[in-house]
Amino acid sequence: MKFAFYTLGCKTNQYETQAMEHLLLEKGHEIGSFEEACDGYVINTCSVTAVADKKNRAVIRRCRRDNPQAVIAVCGCYSQHDPEAVRALGIDVIGGSGQRQAFVEMLLDAAGEKRHEEQLDNALGRREFECLPAGGLEERTRAMLKVQDGCVNFCTYCI
């Protein structure tokens, strides 16, 4: 199957998108462009501001409108923060801001059987680091490497 990714927001989202692409490639799937026909589309969202939320909704709506037969999956802070709004947009797979390996498995299950899947958790209660593969070596001179996951409620801008 062929999947495409659209990433909004921070370096963590960029890293996690690269890791999910890597996981799909390891399983024998292809990664395509968001503008071409694919079996599934993943939108990794940001929710740091109201403007970011508006961009999320616009990208999700456009993707659903342009690809009515494809599986559309949304993960990241927006779906973690407001899963009801994401459900209302008719999304097939909804994941939060963690558990990327499980999210990829849900994506593959939904794409194979065209069914709805959800996996959300308490982001602030998450204490275990999810080890994901480093990515970005093909297109960049530097790879991103995630060294921390979770939160101790110290930042004022994060969800």
Where are these regions (language model features)?
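Proteins enriched for Cys/Gly/acidic motifs involved in redox and nucleic-acid/cofactor modification
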Residues: 1-159
